[in-house]
């Protein structure tokens, strides 16, 4: 093994320990207070300039924030878990301004390269079965209804390890590095607000990735991920008028029927010839009683498109339906955006960097290297990608192979921690290719 492989392998136990620590204390959405504070302390100790709060999140650009009560409850939980040196970071995160960036400068001319790692968990109750390894080995989620069932705990562990290796070997590099630890990836809620705060300013290369998905076994990798779909997440709140269903139905305005009509019409939208489009109404709730004209209704919806224009086509059609059906049923409807991201493709140059790194890595099997693959789903990273590419910068997204016990967002989700070494090895090789000092 070469120097880079040995460096990655040297932090294997640290990464496993970090992954399990974050797994034990999951947080969702904008309420990743504990997670952000722990990361901030660790990165500060490594010599990074850490920024939090309003410096990295534009408050009014956030979507799907949650209630003040939920926010305060999450803060109190974080306080109970943090030591004083960690808890001091909470003040600048109040109101849910979580996530952070960490910056380090070699003081030598060179590229400005960045890495993004997501940090939030998902609203899934973790399996309590004895065979489930986090349960069996004592690092299961400490809170009901929330768990790291998408691998972001592993991403954070890799991010910390990579930050440590770059900081400890800074003489090997030129230029600048930034680490973006993004919250609210689930529901595609976080990237827009962080980008609006300027976290990408000056960045020339942004690298990201995810364990699993189409890289389904240890030793595998997808070097360039394409067709990350654009998406819009929105709720429709419908207000009608209640009335007795038999005695005075004409006095009512039926929000239930309006909601049902909207759902059916949305699913009937003609698809676009220029690429993949998707629509889903995932939740429909309405009504208050058997003999009452339903005065309220609610839809939770999402559109997707192969690119941003295709997604906009679907979203506009949905808005036309909401407006038209509301007029027909004499109801009022309010649309609330809860998330969304752009569509994007990995730059060929970054794909090539990951590909060359994979061929050199002893932790990647040659017969499991896939150079490019379509993702066919959404990832909040795509907003960062698109924003940078529109400025002439480069970005790419890989998938790191791992054996999974169950699929992403499944209550039994767990991954083989060997993939953490492979992931850090690839990221570190990419860092050397982009910013390595000529000696």
Predicted regions and their residues:
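Metal-dependent amide/peptide-bond hydrolase catalytic core
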Residues: 257-439
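Short Gly/Pro-enriched turn/cap motifs at secondary-structure boundaries
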Residues: 89-94, 185, 224-228, 372-376
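Acidic/His- and Gly-rich active-site-bordering loop/insert found
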Residues: 2-148, 161, 172-173
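Divalent metal-coordination and catalytic microenvironments
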Residues: 22, 115, 152, 179, ...
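Histidine/acidic-residue-rich, glycine-tolerant segments that coordinate divalent metal ions
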Residues: 64, 100, 122-124, 133-147, ...
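DPxDG-like acidic metal-binding loop motif
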Residues: 156-162
């Amino acid at each position: 093994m070469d120097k880079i492989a040995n460096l990655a392998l040297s932090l294997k136990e640290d990464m496993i320990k970090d992954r399990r620590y974050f797994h034990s204390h999951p947080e969702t959405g904008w309420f990743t207070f504990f997670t952000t504070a722990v990361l901030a302390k660790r990165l500060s100790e490594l010599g990074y300039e850490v920024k939090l709060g309003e410096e990295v999140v534009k408050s009014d650009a956030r979507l799907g924030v949650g209630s003040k009560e939920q926010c305060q409850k999450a803060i109190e939980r974080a306080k109970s878990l943090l030591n004083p040196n960690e808890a001091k970071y909470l003040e600048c995160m109040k109101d849910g301004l979580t996530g952070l960036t960490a910056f380090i400068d070699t003081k030598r001319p060179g590229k400005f390269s960045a890495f993004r790692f997501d940090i939030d968990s998902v609203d899934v109750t973790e399996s309590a079965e004895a065979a489930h390894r986090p349960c069996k080995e004592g690092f299961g989620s400490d809170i009901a209804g929330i768990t790291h069932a998408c691998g972001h705990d592993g991403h954070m562990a890799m991010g910390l390890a990579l930050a440590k290796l770059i900081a400890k070997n800074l003489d090997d590099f030129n230029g600048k590095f930034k680490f973006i630890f993004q919250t609210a990836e689930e529901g595609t809620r976080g990237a827009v607000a962080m980008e609006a705060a300027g976290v990408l300013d000056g960045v020339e290369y942004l690298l990201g990735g995810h364990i699993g998905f189409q890289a389904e076994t240890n030793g595998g990798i997808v070097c360039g991920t394409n067709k990350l779909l654009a998406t819009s997440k929105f709720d429709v709140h419908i207000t009608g008028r209640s009335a007795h269903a038999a005695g005075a139905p004409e006095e009512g305005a039926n929000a239930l029927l309006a909601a049902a009509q909207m759902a059916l019409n949305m699913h009937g939208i003609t698809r676009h010839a220029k690429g993949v489009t998707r629509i889903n109404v995932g939740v429909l709730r309405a009504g208050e009683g058997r003999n009452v004209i339903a005065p309220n209704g609610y839809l939770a919806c999402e559109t997707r498109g192969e690119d941003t224009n295709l997604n906009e086509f679907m979203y506009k059609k949905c808005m036309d339906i909401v407006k038209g059906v509301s007029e027909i049923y004499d109801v009022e409807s309010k649309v609330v955006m809860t998330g969304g991201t752009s569509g994007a493709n990995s730059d060929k140059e970054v794909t090539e960097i990951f590909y060359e790194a994979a061929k050199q890595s002893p932790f990647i099997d040659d017969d499991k290297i896939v150079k490019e693959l379509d993702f066919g789903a959404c990832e909040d990273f795509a907003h960062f990608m698109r924003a940078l590419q529109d400025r002439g910068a480069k970005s790419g997204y890989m998938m790191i192979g791992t054996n999974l016990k169950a699929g992403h967002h499944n209550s039994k989700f767990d991954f083989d921690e060997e993939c953490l070494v492979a992931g850090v090895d690839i990221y570190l090789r990419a860092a050397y290719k982009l910013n390595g000092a000529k000696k």
